[in-house]
Swiss-Prot record:
Enzyme Commission no: 3.1.-.-
Organism in which the protein naturally occurs: Listeria monocytogenes serovar 1/2a (strain ATCC BAA-679 / EGD-e)
DNA-binding region: 22-90
Residue ranges the record marks as coiled coil: none
HAMAP family, sorted: 3_5_Exoribonuc_YhaM (MF_01427)
Function: Shows a 3'-5' exoribonuclease activity.
Name of the molecule in the record: 3'-5' exoribonuclease YhaM
UniProt superkingdom: Bacteria
Gene field: yhaM
CDD domains: HDc, YhaM_OBF_like
Family per similarity comment: Belongs to the YhaM family.
InterPro entries per the UniProt record, alphabetical: 3'-5'_exoribonuclease_YhaM, HD/PDEase_dom, HD_domain, NA-bd_OB-fold, NA-bd_OB_tRNA, YhaM_exoribonuc/phosphodiest
Domain HD: 163-279
Record keywords, A-Z: DNA-binding, Exonuclease, Hydrolase, Nuclease
GO molecular function: 3'-5'-RNA exonuclease activity; DNA binding
Length: 313
């Protein structure tokens, strides 16, 4: 099987076609310009620097360009980084397309849509079900295509819906264990908690923040969407207020982006399972490329920790 980008170890030489996920111009200490690139294939992404760039390089090596690259894997502050030796733009003769380099969810969109729909059908509270169903229908195309984040966790095509499916499974297990949990409120919170990402983020390819994402953020966006759809459906019960609280508080703390801490049971559960699924996704990503008996590279989204991969099963 052909090795992919993250399969290479420090010290090994890379000779691959890769997709440029991001390209940012900088100035080195010697005053010369360089490009800071994030390069990706289906295995994940690595940072690389292209030094002493010319004006033409900025156009040739911009976002969404496919390049053929030779270089070396290095260790930079506990993380793998790619040192570029040779780089060129891919041409039509190379026969490669962007879709070949984009990581996607391990479950296809149709299966995820069927599973999420089943959870909505199980909801008994008519108001919560109608709001959830209407918002999902409004944004369903983007919901099943978008990543869950720009970086850190589920940052791949269909990552948003995969994150939701994983959380719904966790939510069901929690509700089975604790009968006092309001399943309808919890399921609605899980399905809608990151729906604002379809407005906050630019899309599944070379994802950036939109103007709304930079100025408002996905939490405020989804709460506004709930208010609008509730008005359209003439729903004004307590469910609307409590659902908005569950969504507002799902980051848990003010310093993490939530204006209110969780103050109802389902809000606390949503926060915890969101954190769990995101954390495990980040761990799985680095441990997949860590040999047994060794520590992973540092994970910025998890307090810059390195994780150990045990030798036993």
């Amino acid at each position: 099987m052909e090795k992919r980008l993250l399969d290479f170890e420090v010290g090994e030489t890379v000779d691959l076609f890769l997709l440029i996920k991001s390209s940012v111009k900088g100035t080195a200490s010697n005053g010369k310009p360089f490009l800071s690139l994030v390069l990706q294939d289906k295995s994940g992404e690595l940072e690389a620097k292209l030094w002493d760039v010319k004006e033409s390089d900025e156009a040739n090596y911009g976002v969404q360009q496919i390049v053929h690259l030779m270089g070396d894997i290095q260790n930079y502050r506990g993380r793998k980084q790619l040192k570029i030796r040779q780089i060129r733009q891919a041409t039509a003769l190379d026969g490669v397309s962007a879709s070949e380099f984009m990581e996607t969810a391990p479950i296809n969109k149709e299966e995820m849509a069927d599973e999420i729909t089943q959870y909505i059908f199980e909801m008994k509270n008519a108001n919560l079900q109608r709001i959830t169903r209407a918002l999902l229908k409004k944004y369903q195309d983007d919901f099943y295509d978008y990543p869950a984040a720009m970086r850190h966790h589920h940052e791949f095509v269909s990552g948003l819906s995969f994150h939701v499916v994983s959380m719904l499974r966790l939510a069901k297990s929690v509700a089975d264990l604790y009968p006092s949990v309001n399943r309808d409120l919890l399921y609605a919170g899980v399905i809608l908690h990151d729906l604002g990402k379809v407005i906050e983020l630019s899309g599944p390819v070379s994802t950036t923040y939109t103007l709304e994402g930079n100025l408002i953020g996905h939490i405020s966006i989804v709460v506004e969407e709930v208010s609008k759809i509730a008005d359209e459906l003439s729903i004004d019960g307590e469910e609307v207020v409590v659902l908005k609280h569950v969504l507002l508080s799902h980051h848990g703390k003010g310093e993490w982006g939530s204006p209110k801490p969780p103050l109802v049971r389902e809000a606390e559960i949503l926060h915890q399972i969101d954190l769990m699924d995101a954390s495990l996704n980040m761990m799985d990503k680095v441990l997949k490329h860590t040999k047994p008996g060794e520590f992973s590279e540092r994970v910025f989204g998890l307090d810059n920790r390195s994780f150990y991969n045990p030798t036993f099963e």
